[in-house]
Amino acid sequence: MLFLCYIYELVSYLCFPDILETEYMRSHLLIGAASSGSGKTTFTLGLLRALRNRSLRVQPFKCGPDYIDTRHHKMAAGCASVNLDGFMMSEGHIKDLYARYTSNADVAVTEGVMGLFDGYDAMRGSSAEISGLLRIPIVLVVNAKSTAYSVAPLLYGFRNFRKDLNVVGAVFNFVASESHYSFLRQACEDAGVEALGYLPKCADVEIPSRHLGLSLDED
């Protein structure tokens, strides 16, 4: 428990001054990525704790049936996280759950699953499907290790692949330096996606994985 709380607090101070000041943080946000391992959960946990530390009532959600990430969400946000599963649930049930649990929240943060468009049958059941169904703006977490301006076409593709989705910005993970981030910020500008901040390389900010997902503190 202490280890995880340390991670939440550390991440919340590393990268959020930009994103916390944007209009997108006033209500709803979905955290997506190009692939698993980009840092969605690390970023989401820090964001939940940062919002909580600002005395905001934050409601976390998780795309898919994952029961491990939701337990981390609860520790970071101070309230139970809710699964939104496009495979097991009807669209009506997902909408009802989302409306019910966001009714008393200042901010709702939904963590995606795998890559943004990855579902059980093409995009069916994907984070993108949940975003489109609930009209939630998307922030992409991008693994910037060993890349710089090459993220521009990636961001452009994610922003334009489905016109009904609203990709509002990107946060970069594993950033080596301010100079590195300047290339990434330029890539965002040229791709038409707002750069919202970054997580620097930091060995302390890592939650080990196991076969069913991220490790829990009691493991």
Question: Model segments located where?
Answer:
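Hydrophobic alpha-helical signal peptides and transmembrane signal-/tail-anchor segments
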Residues: M1-L14
